[in-house]
Amino acid sequence: MARRGGCALLVLCGSLAACAWLLGAEARGPGGPVAGARRRRRPQEDGISFEYHRYPELREALVSVWLQCAAVSRIYTVGRSFEGRELLVLELSDNPGVHEPGEPEFKYIGNMHGNEAVGRELLIFLAQYLCNEYQKGNETIVQLIHNTRIHIMPSLNPDGFEKAASQLGELKDWFVGRSNAQGIDLNRNFPDLDRIVYINEKEGGPNNHLLKNLKKIVDQNTKLAPETKAVIHWIMDIPFVLSANLHGGDLVANYPYDETRSGSAHEYSSCPDDDIFQSLARAYSSFNPPMSDPDRPPCRKNDDDSSFVEGTTNGAAWYSVPGGMQDFNYLSSNCFEITVELSCEKFPPEETLKNYWEDNKNSLISYIQQIHRGVKGFVRDLQGNPIANATLSVEGIDHDVTSAKDGDYWRLLVPGNYKLTASAPGYLAIAKKVAVPYSPAVRVDFELESFSERKEEEKEELMEWWKMMSETLNF
C-alpha cells in the first residue's frame, strides 16, 4: 500500500483508527525508532506480494489483510523490541480476540534471528493467502479458520531484520542482524528449563509447567531481552496447543529436545512425546519437496546432516541448543513447538521468495491442521462448572497437560490406545480408556466429584443404612 497523502490514505485504511495506527510506523515518537526506508512495491500475484517487507511495509501488509478480512481477523502486539518496534501478530478466527471454549490456539513465529528472512516473508504471504482463500470459499481454509484460532507473528526480531536488510547488495553477511539490538541471540535467551527437567527425571519433580506462578521472576530477570519477555508472557497467557518457529540456514524440521542430556555437542535427546513430535515434524517436511528429498546434498560442503531423516531431526542430535524457545514452550506450557529451517541461504534474493512460498505453502497449512489430532474435551465438576488447571495424564508418557480457564484441554497423540486420567486438587481422579485415530481429535469429557461431595454422599448413604437397620431391627 503506497502512501498518497493523509486523505487518500484515510480512504485506503477504511477507518481513522486503522489509518492512525498505520501512520504510527512512520513517525518518530519520543525516543522511538526510525522504522526503516520504504521501497518501490512489486505488484501482487494472486493477492500475495512476493517481496521483502521492511518494518513499515510489514505493518501495511498486515493492516491490508485485517481490512480485507475484518470479520475474521485482528492485529495486536505482544510488546516492543529493544528499539521500540512493535512485535505484531495477525490473528485469524471466526471470533477474533476471543478464546472460544473447545477451540485450540495455534501460533507461527518467524524471524527470531533477524537475518533469517524467509520465515518472516512466508508468514506475511500465509496471512494474505488465508484471507484470500477464505473469501473465495476454499472449504479447507474456511474450516481451519472457523475451528482454530490462528496467531501469526512474522517477526520476533524486527530490529535485527532492519539491520540485516540495510546491507547493500544481494549478498548479506551470515551474522549481521542475527541478534537483537542488544546483541542477544534470542534463541539462547529463554530460561533453560531442559536442565531442570533433566534433574527432575533423576530425582523426581514436575514434568511440565516449570514456570508456573513465576511471571514476576521473568519480569525481574535483567538477562532476558524485551522480545524474550514479551513472548514468554504471550506463551503463558494464551492456551496455545501447537506452534512452529521458522528459521533459515538449512532445510529441516527440528523437534525436541534441543539440548542434550549429557552436555555433549550432539546426542539424540528424546522428550516424552517423541512419537508425536516426529509425526508433527514429518507433517511439515513431507509436503516440502526439497526438505524431504533424501538425495538433497547438504547446504554447505562440510555440513553434518547425518541426523536428518525424511527432512526431520531431533534438535539435540543435530547440535545442542540451551535456552531455546522450542523446548521452553514444551516445558513451560501446554504448547508443542517445532523449529523449521526453511532455506540454505538466510537472506536469499527477493526473486526467489515465490519459489520458497511454493515449496512451503502446503506444509504451512498441513502443520496447522495437526492441531486437530489426539484427544480433546472438557473437565468439569458434577454441577457442570469448568475446572481450570486440571491435570491430564497419559499412561506411559511422562508429560502432562492442563486444562484452560474454561476447563477445555487438548492432548496431541499419535494413533493408538491410551489410558487418560484427569485430576485436580480437591477432586477424585477419573481414568478413561480411549482409542485415538490419526484425526480428527477424539472428544473425551471428564466430570470430577469433589471430596466434599463424596463425604456428603457417604454421609447420606450411612444415614439411609442406619434408617433401614433401625426399621428392620425395631430400634
Swiss-Prot record:
The EC number(s) this enzyme carries: 3.4.17.10
Keywords: Carboxypeptidase, Cleavage on pair of basic residues, Cytoplasmic vesicle, Glycoprotein, Hydrolase, Membrane, Metal-binding, Metalloprotease, Protease, Secreted, Signal, Zinc, Zymogen
Matches recorded under CDD domains: M14_CPE (cd03865), Peptidase_M14NE-CP-C_like (cd11308)
Compartments, as annotated in UniProt: Cytoplasmic vesicle, Secretory vesicle; Cytoplasmic vesicle, Secretory vesicle membrane; Secreted
Organism listed in the record: Bos taurus (Bovine)
Membrane topology annotation: Peripheral membrane protein
Stated role: Sorting receptor that directs prohormones to the regulated secretory pathway. Also acts as a prohormone processing enzyme in neuro/endocrine cells, removing dibasic residues from the C-terminal end of peptide hormone precursors after initial endoprotease cleavage.
Any GO BP annotation: protein localization to membrane
Protein name: Carboxypeptidase E
